[in-house]
Regions:
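C-terminal non-catalytic interaction/assembly regions of soluble proteins
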Residues: 60-213
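Accessory alpha-helical/coil subdomains and C-terminal extensions
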Residues: 2-98
C-alpha cells in the first residue's frame, strides 16, 4: 500500500490476522472493488484467523507442521491462496483469478531491499558480536524506536521474545478490517528509506476490446 499514489491503485484489500476473517464479508469486499474498478488486488496474511482464533489455512492443510515452539508453520503454503481464488471464481463468476503465494521471493530480491533495513541489520549483528565477545552475554538484540525515527539497540532475555508474536496495533487497521490506515503508513515510511521503487503509469487510455471469444 505504500507505493500507491492514486485511489484506484492496489492492493485494494488487505487482510491481517488481528481481524477475524469472514468468507462472506471477503466476497462482499471483493465484489465491491471489482464492480467499481474492473479488477481487484488483494494482500492476505497467511496467518488470518476465523472468529474463534483458528488459522483459516489449517482447515485446508492435510499435514499441519509446527516449529520448536509449537507455532503452526504456514510460510510458503499455497493452500490458502488456492482456496480464496477458487471461492472468488465460484461466488462471483470471475474467470481470471490468480493467487501467488510468496515464500522467499520478497526476502531475497535485492532490488527491493530497504537501505534502512540494510544498515540496521548490520548494526544488530555488530551489537550481537559485541555482547557475546566483549561482555560474554547472551540474549536477543532488540531494536527500540525513539522519536520520529531514531533507534537504540538493547540486549534482552530470550524468554521475552521466544515463541511470542508482536501484534499489529488496532490503529493501523481500518474499521472495516480490510486495509491499512494512514497511521500505519506514517509508521512504516521511515523504515523504507529513500530508494522505494516508483510506480509508473501509462498515459494512454484503454483500447476497446474487438475480438470476443
Amino acid at each position: 500500500g505504500m507505493a500507491s499514489k492514486r485511489p484506484e491503485d492496489g492492493p485494494h484489500l488487505v487482510y491481517l490476522p488481528e481481524t477475524p476473517f469472514c468468507m462472506d464479508k471477503f466476497i462482499t469486499d471483493v465484489k465491491e472493488v471489482y464492480d467499481r474498478l474492473g479488477r481487484c488486488v488483494i494482500a492476505v496474511s497467511e496467518g488470518i484467523v476465523d472468529e474463534t482464533g483458528l488459522p483459516i489455512v489449517t482447515k485446508y492443510m492435510e499435514n499441519i507442521e509446527r516449529d520448536d515452539h509449537g507455532n503452526i508453520s504456514m510460510s510458503g503454503n499455497s493452500a490458502l491462496g488456492d482456496v480464496l481464488a477458487r471461492l472468488i471464481k465460484d461466488k462471483l463468476k470471475i474467470k481470471r483469478v490468480r493467487a501467488d503465494t510468496f515464500g522467499y521471493i520478497q526476502r531475497c530480491f535485492l532490488g527491493c531491499v530497504s537501505e534502512v533495513d540494510q544498515q540496521e541489520s548490520r548494526e544488530v549483528g555488530e551489537k550481537a558480536v559485541h555482547f557475546a565477545v566483549a561482555e560474554n552475554k547472551s540474549g536477543s538484540i532488540c531494536i527500540k524506536r525513539t522519536g520520529d525515527y531514531l533507534v537504540d539497540y538493547e540486549l534482552i532475555d530470550f524468554c521475552c521474545v521466544a515463541a511470542l508474536t508482536k501484534k499489529m496495533p488496532s490503529q493501523f487497521i481500518n474499521e472495516e478490517g480490510n486495509n491499512i490506515t494512514p497511521a500505519f503508513k506514517d509508521y512504516l515510511r521511515p523504515l523504507l528509506g529513500r530508494n522505494i521503487t516508483e510506480v509508473a503509469y501509462l498515459s494512454s487510455g484503454k483500447i476497446p476490446k474487438i475480438i470476443n471469444k
